[in-house]
């Protein structure tokens, strides 16, 4: 009698396991097809010189596919030249994306003077540096949760000259 009960329990466990696997597959497929915001880096420009360092600003366009606004949890960035990280940081809670539209985010990047001077020594011939900017935009999408969209761009940044200081 115990072996018959064990068979019934095993059959029920098998059916439940099969249903759970089907449910996981269904939800994974549905979540994979959920639209997410799309982002592109439009421009990276020299902004100015302060007492703390050299300021650059990246303009990032983010398209929201939803009719409701989506909160941005944080923006993280890493600015590299060659293989060396020259600036990194995080901007907590920078605002929200407008519903069914494109939001342009301004990502300020500050390069310390010590790093800028060493870059000037390395790049004194053409007064610009080749860079790679990696940005991670973290959004809080209802039902799905927090997602991070990586955006990367490469190009050249103008180094400040003496006329930028005066």
From Swiss-Prot:
It comes from the Eukaryota. GO terms for cellular component: cytosol; plasma membrane. One of its GO terms (biological process) is response to desiccation. Belongs to the LEA type 2 family. This is Desiccation-related protein At2g46140. The lineage of its organism: Eukaryota, Viridiplantae, Streptophyta, Embryophyta, Tracheophyta.
């Amino acid at each position: 009698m115990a072996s018959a009960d064990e068979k019934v329990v095993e059959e029920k466990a098998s059916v439940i396991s099969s249903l759970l696997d089907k449910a996981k597959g269904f939800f994974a497929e549905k979540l994979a097809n959920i639209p997410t915001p799309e982002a592109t880096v439009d421009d990276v420009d020299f902004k100015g010189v302060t007492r703390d360092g050299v300021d650059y600003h990246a303009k990032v366009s983010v398209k929201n596919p939803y009719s409701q606004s989506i909160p941005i949890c944080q923006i993280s960035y890493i600015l590299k030249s060659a293989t060396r990280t020259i600036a990194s940081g995080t901007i907590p809670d920078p605002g929200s994306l407008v519903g069914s539209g494109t939001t342009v985010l301004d990502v300020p990047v500050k390069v310390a003077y010590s790093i800028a001077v060493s870059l000037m020594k390395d790049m004194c011939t053409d007064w610009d540096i080749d860079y790679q900017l990696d940005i991670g935009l973290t959004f809080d999408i209802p039902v799905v949760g927090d997602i991070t969209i990586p955006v990367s761009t490469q190009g050249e940044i103008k180094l400040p000259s003496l006329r930028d200081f005066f």
